[in-house]
Amino acid sequence: MKLKDTKSRPKQSSYGKFQTKGIKVVGKWKEVKIDPNMFADGQMDDLVCFEELTDYQLVSPAKNPSSLFSKEAPKRKAQAVSEEEEEEEGESSSPKKKIKLKKSKNVATEGTSTQKEFEVKDPELEAQGDGMVCDDPEAGEMTSENLVQTAPKKKKNKAKKGLEPSQSTAAKVPKKAKTWIPEVHDQKADVSAWKDLFVPRPVLRALSFLGFSAPTPIQVLTLAPAIRDKLDILGAAETGSGKTLAFAIPMIHAVLQWQKRNAAPPPSNTEAPPGETRPEAGAETRSPGKAEAESDALPDDTVIESEALPSDTAAEARAKTGGTVSDQALLFGDDDAGEGPSSLIREKPVPKQNENEEENLDKEQTGNLKQELDDKSATCKTYPKRPLLGLVLTPTRELAVQVKQHIDAVARFTGIKTAILVGGMSTQKQQRMLNRRPEIVVATPGRLWELIKEKHYHLRNLRQLRCLVVDEADRMVEKGHFAELSQLLEMLNDSQYNPKRQTLVFSATLTLVHQAPARILHKKHTKKMDKTAKLDLLMQKIGMRGKPKVIDLTRNEATVETLTETKIHCETDEKDFYLYYFLMQYPGRSLVFANSISCIKRLSGLLKVLDIMPLTLHACMHQKQRLRNLEQFARLEDCVLLATDVAARGLDIPKVQHVIHYQVPRTSEIYVHRSGRTARATNEGLSLMLIGPEDVINFKKIYKTLKKDEDIPLFPVQTKYMDVVKERIRLARQIEKSEYRNFQACLHNSWIEQAAAALEIELEEDMYKGGKADQQEERRRQKQMKVLKKELRHLLSQPLFTESQKTKYPTQSGKPPLLVSAPSKSESALSCLSKQRKKKTKKPKEPQPEQPQPSTSAN
C-alpha cells in the first residue's frame, strides 16, 4: 500500500488550526510504521497513514491572542520553520520552568499505540505562556488524531475560565429584584404596641426589622378579631392606612397554626427509609417536629417560630436577599435561575479526558439530570401535608406584585413560601413556582382560573384553604368585570367549600355608594342602594356565611385629611396648556390620570416633543414594561407618569407629590382611589382636576357623593406666562399630529404592500392611505417639519418663567433690558395654594350700612 508523502503535510491548514488550539508546531511530522497484517481483513482499506509530531510547544491563547487568531494568510513552510527556530533560540536563553505532568494510562485498542493523558499541576501554566515546553519525551507519542480531540476541550475549558469572574460575582451578590417599593434596612424598632394584638413572634421580629413601631387604626381593630376570634372581616379604611398588613398578618398566623397542628413527629431511627435519601448535614429542612422535639418548654409563639423557621441563618439570608432568586425572576419576567450568564453556577475546571471518559461523563450527567427531575416530581408527590392555605385575589397585576412583596417582608422569619399568579407573564414559570407547593398564593382572577382549569395538582384541592382575601372587593365584584372571579367564588362556596375558612374583604371605598345612572333610576323596580344594601350584596357575591365583623373607618368625604383638593375650569383644548404649565412650574413626582388609552398616547407624544419624557402605564402595554416604568417612576424624583385607571387602585408609590386628573373620573370610587396615590401614611399631597365642559356632570356627581361641605378651591395660575405656553403647545401639536399621521400612513401602506405581495396582485393608488407617496410632496413636508422643530427648539431654549424689567427711560447701553428669571421654583404647589387661601381669609369684610332704628316717642 502506497503511503502519502509526508512532505505535503505542512501545506494543509493544520498549522494554523493547531496554533489557534494552543499547540505550536516546531518540528516535522513523521511517519508511523504500521504492521501490514492489520490490513489483511480488509476493514482498514481507507486508512492512508499515521503521522506523529514529537517537537512542539504548548501555547497559551490568553498570552498573545492577536497572534493566535490572526486572519493573515499562512506562510510558507520554510519561512515558518525558520521563524519558529529563531523564536526557540531566543526563548532558550531564558530559564525554562519544568512542569510536572501527571500520566493517566488508558486501555488502547489493538494495533495502536497507548495514548497518554496529561493534567497540568502547575497553576502558573497560563501565566508562563510561550515560555513553556514539555520536557517529557513520551509526549511525542501523541498522534494527530488525539491532538485534534484535545484541542476543542481546551477551548471549552478556556471559555469556562472566561466566565468564572462573572460566575463568582453572581454567586456572591444575590439577585436583586427591581421594585417600586423602597428598601428597608434593619431598624430594630420597639414593637411592644403590637403584642396585645396576638401577633406571632416571628412576625413581630419582622415588624421590628421593618421599623413598624405602632399599628394603624385599621390594624388595631382588625388583628385581634381576626387572629383571636377568627371572624370574617369586612374592612373599609382610607387609602394608605395599612390594609395590606391588616389581612397579611392573620393569614400568616393561620398558616403557622396549621403547621403547628400538622407537625410530623421526629423519626425514631437514624437511618432513612428505603427509597429515600438522607438529607445532608446543615441542610435546611421544613420539619417543624424537629424544632418541637428540641425544646418542649417553649411558649406557644416560640414553638410556632421554631416550627416555621428551622434554621435562623437561612431565614436571615432570605430576609437580606428579599426572597429567592427564582421568586424574583418570576416576578419581573427574567430568565429562570440557571439560564443565562448571570445565574450560572461556578464550576471547577474539568481536566482533559479522552473520548471514552467524556461519553461516560455525559451519560452520568444525563442520568443525574433525569434522577433530579424524578426527585423533584417525587418531592411534589411526597408533600401531601403542604396544601394551599392562603389565597389573595387582587384586581390588577401591579397590585398583586406589591401585595406579595409586603407579605414576603412580614413573613421573612417564618419560612412560609409565597407565589404570584398574574397574566402577562410566563405560564410555565408560574407552574414551576406552584410545583414548590407554596402556602400562600397572590393572584389575579384570570390567570388563577386558567391554571385551575388546567388542573394543576397544587390547585386541585382548595378545601384546605384556611384564609381567603379579596382586596379592592368593590371593584372585583362589579357587574361586567372579572367573569372568572364569579366562577371561582362559586366553586369555593360549592364543591370546594370549607367551613373553617376565614374570609377577609378590604377596600377604601367598600361603604361608599354613588348615585346610579339615570337610565337605571327611571326603571320601575329599581331599589335605591345604600351602605347596608351594598354590604349585603357584596357578602352574597363573595359567599360569606354568618355575620362578619364590619370595620368602617372612612370619613364622609372618603379622602384622607392630608390631601389638598383643587381644580381648574377650562375649555377642552386648553387642558394641554394648564397641564404643561403645572408640570413646568411645579416639578416633582406627578401622576397624570386619563380615562382612555388613546388620550394617554396622545399626551405622551405631545410631552415628548416638548422635551418632557413621560412614562406610560396602561393595559395594552407588556407586563415587563409596566413594571419597569413603575420602578423608574419611583426611582426618579422629577418624573411624570401618564396612566389609566390600571394604576388607580392599591399601588403604594413613595413620595408622589401631585395627582392630576386630566379627565374627570366617571365615578366617585375611581376619584377616591386616584387621589389616594398621594398623601399616603400621613404625608401631604395635591389632587388637581382639569374640568372641561364635558366633565361638569361627572364633577357634580362626585361632589354630591363625597358630601363636600365647602367648594373645592381654584388653583392659582399666573396668566402672564400663558401666552408663551400657548405658543409652545401650538407648535408641539402641529409636530405631533404630523408625525402621528405619517406613522399611521406608513404602517398601513406597509401592511397593504406585504399583503399584496403575498397575494401577487397590483395595488392601485387609492388603496394607499393618503395616496401614493410623492417624493416632491414628502420633501415639502419634511422641510416644513424642520422649520417647525427649529422654531420650537428656539422657544424651549429660553426660560419659560421670566420677568422683564420695565424702564421709564432708555438704557445706557442702548440695548433692550435683559430678561430676569422668575423667583426660584422651591415653592411647592401646596404652599402656593395655602398662600392664596390666607389672602382670601385676610380680606376684610365690607361694612354694612347701619339701618336707622325706629324712634320711640313718648305719648
Swiss-Prot record:
User: Gene encoding this polypeptide?
Assistant: DDX24
Q: What is this protein called?
A: ATP-dependent RNA helicase DDX24
Q: Where in the cell is it found?
A: Cytoplasm; Nucleus
Q: Which residues carry this modification: Phosphothreonine?
A: 302
Q: What is the lineage of its organism?
A: Eukaryota, Metazoa, Chordata, Craniata, Vertebrata
SMART domains per the UniProt record, alphabetical: DEXDc (SM00487), HELICc (SM00490)
Q: Where is the Helicase C-terminal domain?
A: 578-723
Q: Where in the sequence is N6-acetyllysine found? A: 17, 71
Q: Which InterPro entries does this chain map to?
A: DEAD/DEAH_box_helicase_dom, Helicase_ATP-bd, Helicase_C-like, P-loop_NTPase, RNA-helicase_DEAD-box_CS, RNA_helicase_DEAD_Q_motif
Per the record, residues carrying Phosphoserine are: 60, 82, 94, 287, 295
Compositional bias segments (type: Basic residues): 95-105
Map out region (Disordered) in residue numbers.
61-175, 262-374, 799-859
Q: Which keywords annotate this record?
A: Acetylation, ATP-binding, Cytoplasm, Helicase, Hydrolase, Isopeptide bond, Nucleotide-binding, Nucleus, Phosphoprotein, RNA-binding, Ubl conjugation
Q: Name one GO cellular component term.
A: nucleolus
* Species: Pongo abelii
Q: How is it modified after translation?
A: Ubiquitinated by MDM2 without targeting DDX24 for proteasomal degradation. Instead, polyubiquitylated DDX24 promotes interaction with NIP7, a component of pre-rRNP processing complex, and associates with pre-rRNA molecules and pre-ribosomal particles.
